[in-house]
Amino acid sequence: MKRGRFLAPLLVFLIVAGFLAVGLNRNPRELPSPLIGKTAPEFSAETVGSPEKVFSPSQMVGKVWLLNVWASWCVSCRTEHPMLMKFAQQRIAPVVGLNYKDKEGDGAQWLQRHGDPYIVSVFDPEGRIGIDYGVYGVPETFVIDTKGVIKLRHAGPITQELLDERITPLIKKLNGQ
């Protein structure tokens, strides 16, 4: 009887310690996404700076591409912007922007001021497209394959290390290089 009184708290402690150990070993930048391995959500939206033009992910079928979620008010987006500019100049894969929860005109002005790495950037003022993609915040980047399937999701600013070690090798693999 006395033995059971001591074993129960010990067992509870070991279970809690196990969950804690698993949690501490996870990368906080890698938020789980149920969309990995699934077709990217379809949408049709006006483009930043050219509302008469409309973009849909179905236009990218047959290409490996990046979807980068950004906003003019996002400080981290400014941090990653030089990396996106460099990546776009290398023409490794087309980059599509998703201007998330911004005011009309702010995104276009921001791109004019800082440079435009996107083949097109769509306007998502209410964040509905972002919700469909499970966006937690900005910036976020998705790698989407030739069939429109999401292969990678990265929350946070893109770094040179991330481009060199994960994104570019994945794109080359998906392109059969």
Give residue spans per PLM region.
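Short pre-active-site segment immediately N-terminal to redox-active cysteine/selenocysteine motifs
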Residues: T39, K63-W65, V69-W73, G137
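Thiol/disulfide oxidoreductase modules built on the thioredoxin-like
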Residues: F6, Q112-P117, D124-N175
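A short beta-strand-turn-helix
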Residues: F43-L66
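A generic structural signal for alpha->beta connector loops
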Residues: E42, I92-A93, Y118-I119
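N-terminal targeting signals for export/organelle localization
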Residues: M1-E46, Q177
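Short gly/ser/thr-rich secondary-structure transition/capping motifs
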Residues: N25-N27, E46-E52, S121-D124
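Hydrophobic beta-strand core positions in alpha/beta domains
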Residues: L66-N68, G97, V143
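Structural microenvironment flanking redox-active thiols in thiol-disulfide oxidoreductases
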Residues: R78-G115, P125-I131
